């Protein structure tokens, strides 16, 4: 259907004086057109409005569903509902990691659906659900998914392995550190830090010289989480706005995130040596969150915490 003509479009020239009492002759077919508009277009618009209202209230109600409701929706025959349910469950588990413990058979159900799912988006969210439940039986499934044909599914699987926190994930994650895809390397570096296993330190250290900035940053942050100061030189670059500005395509939000993470990491592994840096950032940095993080780091260092 063609786009409607704008009834308020300006005329090309000023109108001449017309007698308002004189009606213009009706063009042939205009009556039929009005009938068509009245009988078809207007009712159609009403129907569309009702559908929009119905969908809107449906989503509001959906947002209030329980964990059990979402588990049921994972079995739905409608793909969008299944994917949305997996996404909602992954969010619930962030605030309540034991949410599925309250539902008998839920973990086994998620493992089964993860194995059966052939939709990449569904598998990605289910991977996060598996990781956030702390279900150790899910590790073999996530390890296999780390070799999936879909790169984004691989990233979610690696991420979930880190969230799971099972030390047995160390070797599969270490293998991913040498992948040709920088997104895979970055996620593997992050996930190894989440394992809190110091034996991962020597596996991570070579990635401090990675050609990709994101990989170096995540490696340095993970090393700090593991108690190693090997990444301090990289962390120092992450709080230098002059160097951050040279990173291609970096956004202000990403700069802020990098600085906040680096400040906390430096405070944890090299605190006293960077006291002056924290003081300077607390006074001079233009970002409020960065100043606040630097003040907290300086206070922690001064108190010996």
Predicted regions and their residues:
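Amphipathic alpha-helical scaffolding segments comprising HEAT/armadillo-like alpha-solenoid repeats
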Residues: 61-73, 95-115, 135-147, 166-178, ...
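N-terminal intrinsically disordered, acidic low-complexity segments at the extreme N-terminus
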Residues: 1-29
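Structural signature of alpha-helical solenoid repeat scaffolds
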Residues: 90-91, 131, 162, 193, ...
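Extracytoplasmic/periplasmic/luminal assembly and interaction segments
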Residues: 75-79, 84-135, 182, 190, ...
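Hydrophobic membrane-insertion alpha-helices, especially the h-region
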Residues: 38-58
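Short inter-helical turns and helix N-cap capping residues of alpha-solenoid HEAT/ARM repeat scaffolds
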Residues: 77-78, 118-119, 149-150, 180-181, ...
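Conserved hydrophobic register position within alpha-solenoid helical repeats
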Residues: 85, 126, 157, 188, ...
